Design a protein with these regions (language model features):
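Short, strongly hydrophobic alpha-helical membrane anchors
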Residues: 8, 12-45
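Low-acidity, Ser/Thr- and Arg-rich intrinsically disordered low-complexity segments
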Residues: 4-6
């Protein structure tokens, strides 16, 4: 193993002695050049660390099991509560089972494609070396492993969604019972811990899958991890698309008929779509978001190993590969500590408790990562980039809250616009959504600039010590100031961020121009690793929202006491804000992960064609065509999704109106047929999955083989830029309209039942498919296209020209895309009532 490189970047002058320090703390002895199962010169110390990471993944899953037992032991409330809860549980489980059956055929076909892809393009040199130069053996083993990894990735994504959603459903009735019996703190504990199960499943399975593949395949793992990442990403796309259409079709249909036309309250039991609405919260916000963040978690592992191997080839250091896995392990531990601490804060504000716990997790991760980078790698720059990622996630909290919280002046301005009708509400929300996209973009740009600065500029040595001392003094001042004002936690974290900034400046160092691109891309990947280091916290905060919402709905349907209803309303309000915040984090992480994959795309091409330059020349008309096509696809995808929601919502509205014509249902004397609306929503969501999935998978294939690799690079750039801006716009505009409506419902500007309230409901209805369907679905769509491009890029380079086979394949891909667009953009010629009858008849005959 080459001697470790030492640099004057605020690092250890003798990293070997740092290693020995860790060894004395319990690590195994250092052995140079040890040949092992990884087929790399990896030391025993690093082997032990990797297996510890695997053990941490097991701890996360064990913690999820402990939380599950805690939730299941809680009281489920009275018979009336359990009756309504049973409808929600059965509907959610039936939906996910139907969805998995729908996508199973496509998953099976793509598993075969993953297997065959290795035989079309030879494995990487690292994979051949791993199998001692036996290319035939390498092809066969990698082909089998990639196909199995694809199945494992999609299965893990489905498990996170299914089991996480199931525990959210189990938790919601128990939250309602706790609000009736135990009060605010008990209800908060059960709601958050129910969501934490999903967070720990995401952490544990993501870390387990990536680490296991690395342990088995070592330097050949990127060839296999492509399948793992693609499987998780594709399943997440289906979960987002299907769950998003389901939840918003039911929500829009229930609101427009129930609130606007019939003047009903939220979750009125006379509304036939109320159970479908509550089911939708689980399949969309629980299962969909969990799978979404899980695949971002996977993708950053894939990128870090691909780019880490590239840097290891440059200077022989293995910490480029191992350190991201160790940071992930630290993140899991910090998430366990932080999520457990939520129930320990004695505050009557759920948001405050969750934010404090997030800060605790952030502090543990940052301090531990700096210690790891200093003692293990001897490079503080690695820790500062992870800290930038953590800071990026933390920054999205106030940024998204400013755009979407009911406490924000921006949102209250939208509420005030209800005095002038729905059009004014829509215009205010559009303005806020567009502006917030720019704010979010600049935050992401700033974080990416950090990766550029760290490896592009040399901080003068004579200023390093003074800057460190100034940072330390300012940090101490902030801590003391916080202690004097009884805000020690806030003071500590303010001081910590000041010190991080000082260390960031100190760690800046210039790398050789020839390798700078690879270093910067790895830095971007570390930012993504840092941003998702608290995946457990993020998913817990997001799942807390639908759990509280469902508990509130069960309380309304069951006629619970006003005190309990108020507790659940307060939790629901906090959940709306945390859901919006985690959407921002999910979008930001999707962009960072996509940029990392973008860099891996060029590295992948260079393995096949070493002369390929890592430049996308926009002056080339063909490349510009690729850019335009890529930029248009998020718009196409969003348009088709919104139309699908509207089409399904019309069916729900027709069904609710039909049932309300029954005087007994309208008076409350008879229970509506809730199952009918659930069935319509399920059927409507499933028929959209395959067409939209085909567009995401086939578009980069068609562009790559028709316009070649440079245009494919432009295509990806267009998808990332357009998708990020559009996703933030839709998420924040929709969230702002939602909370503007809730602000009116709290008694401002006329309150419930007023004309102003009806105007706010219109705004909320417009925003629903934006924030919960189209916007979130763009996250996995961006990464599906990037991963498909990563897989086909070597094929595009290796098979130059336009043979008959390539032209036939491209024509077939384009034909399928056209079919998918026409299928999703279809017009229903029948009236909604007639469609309901037709769909019902089809489902009855199918049964």
């Amino acid at each position: 193993m080459p001697k470790r490189r030492t640099t004057a970047i605020g690092a250890c002058t003798d990293p070997t002695s740092s290693r020995l320090l860790l060894v004395t703390l319990g690590a195994a002895a250092r052995q140079e050049g040890y040949r092992n199962m990884f087929q790399m010169d990896i030391e025993v110390f690093e082997q032990v660390m990797v297996f510890i990471v695997l053990a941490i993944a097991g701890v996360a899953l064990g913690y999820a099991l402990w939380l599950r037992n805690f939730i299941m032991s809680a009281d489920k409330g009275n018979a009336e509560m359990q009756r309504h809860w049973g409808h929600i549980r059965d509907g959610a489980n039936a939906y996910l089972r139907t969805q998995l059956k729908t996508v199973a055929v496509l998953i099976a076909l793509l598993t075969v494609a993953m297997f065959l892809s290795v035989f079309v393009v030879k494995p990487t040199p690292e994979a051949n070396e791993y199998f001692d130069g036996n290319e035939d053996k390498a092809r066969l083993v990698i082909a089998i492993a990639r196909a199995l990894a694809f199945v494992m990735g999609s299965s893990f994504s489905a498990m996170v969604g299914f089991f996480g959603m199931n525990m959210a459903v189990q938790g919601n009735v128990r939250v309602a019972a706790a609000a009736e019996r135990g009060g605010y703190q008990e209800a908060l504990k059960i709601a958050y811990r129910s969501g934490t199960i999903t967070g720990m499943l995401t952490d544990g399975l993501g870390l387990f899958g990536g680490t296991t593949i690395f342990i088995i395949f070592g330097k050949a793992s990127p060839d296999v991890l492509l399948g793992f990442g693609f499987g998780g990403t594709l399943l997440a796309l289906f979960m987002r698309v299907g769950g998003g259409i389901y939840t918003k079709a039911a929500d829009v249909g229930a609101d427009l008929v129930g609130k606007v036309e019939a003047g009903m309250e939220e979750d009125d039991p006379r509304n036939a779509a109320v159970v479908a609405d509550l089911v939708g919260d689980n399949v969309g916000d629980c299962a969909g978001m969990a799978a979404d963040i899980f695949e971002s978690y996977e993708v950053t592992i894939v990128s870090s190993l691909i780019l880490g191997l590239a840097l290891t080839a440059i200077n022989g250091e293995l910490y480029w590969i191992v350190l991201p896995l160790l940071v992930r392990g630290i993140g899991v531990v910090s998430s366990i500590v932080g999520t457990y601490a939520v129930s320990l804060w004695r505050v009557d504000d759920a948001e405050e408790a969750m934010y404090k716990s997030y800060e605790v997790s952030s502090g543990i991760t940052i301090l531990s990562t700096f210690l790891l980078a200093w003692l293990y790698a001897g490079q503080l720059s690695l820790a500062t980039l992870v800290a930038v990622g953590v800071a990026l996630a933390v920054t999205f909290n106030p940024l998204t809250s400013y755009a979407t919280s009911a406490k924000s002046k921006r949102v209250q301005t939208i509420s005030a616009a209800t005095r002038f009708g729905p059009a004014s509400v829509i215009l205010e929300g559009l303005s806020l959504g567009y502006l917030s996209s720019v704010w979010a973009l600049f935050v992401i740009v700033t974080s990416l600039a950090a990766a550029i600065l760290v490896y592009s500029y040399e901080f003068p040595n004579e200023y390093k010590l003074p800057v460190a001392l100034i940072g330390l003094v300012l940090a101490v001042i902030m801590i003391v100031r916080g202690r004097m004002r009884n805000h020690l936690v806030e003071g500590f974290f303010a001081g910590m961020w000041i010190m991080v900034f000082a260390l960031f400046l100190i760690s800046m160092h210039q790398v050789p121009d020839v390798h700078r691109y690879s270093y910067i891309l790895f830095g971007v990947t570390l930012i993504g690793v840092g941003m998702l280091s608290h995946t457990g916290n993020n998913v817990s905060m997001d799942t807390f929202g639908p759990i509280s919402d469902n508990a509130n709905g069960i309380g309304e349907l069951s006629g619970m006491s006003p005190k309990a209803r108020q507790i659940m309303a307060d939790l629901d309000a906090a959940g709306n804000t945390t859901k919006a915040i985690t959407k921002g984090v999910a979008i930001g992480s999707a962009v960072i992960a996509a940029v990392s994959l973008f860099g891996s795309f060029f590295s992948d091409i260079q393995r096949v064609n070493p002369d390929f330059e890592k430049i996308v020349n926009l002056a080339d008309p063909v490349v510009f065509v690729g850019l335009l096509i890529g930029g248009s696809l998020p718009l196409l995808f969003s348009g088709l999704l919104i139309k699908a929601v509207n089409r399904a919502a019309n069916l729900i509205m027709a069904e609710v109106r039909r049932q309300l014509r029954d005087p007994e249902i309208a008076s409350g004397a008879k229970t509506p047929d809730y199952a009918q609306a659930v069935t319509i929503s399920t059927h409507s969501a499933q028929i959209e999955l395959v067409p939209l999935g085909l567009i995401a998978v086939l578009a980069p294939i068609a562009v790559g083989f028709l316009l070649k690799e440079q245009a494919l690079g432009g295509f990806l750039a267009g998808v990332i830029l357009s998708g990020q801006l559009l996703a933030v716009f839709m998420a924040n505009a929709g969230g702002a309209w939602d909370n503007a409506k809730k602000y009116v419902e709290d008694g401002y500007f006329g309150g419930k039942g007023s004309e102003n309230h009806k105007a706010s409901v219109v705004g909320d209805t417009v925003g629903d498919p934006l924030k919960d369907t189209a916007g979130p679905a763009l996250n996995p769509m961006i990464k599906v296209m990037n991963l498909v491009a990563l897989i086909v890029a070597p094929l595009v380079v290796e098979y130059e020209g336009y043979s008959a086979g390539i032209l036939i394949g491209v024509a077939l891909a384009i034909a399928l895309i056209v079919w998918a667009v026409r299928r999703s953009d279809r017009e229903d010629t029948l009236a909604a009532e007639e469609v309901v009858e037709r769909v019902t008849a089809e489902m009855v005959s199918a049964d």
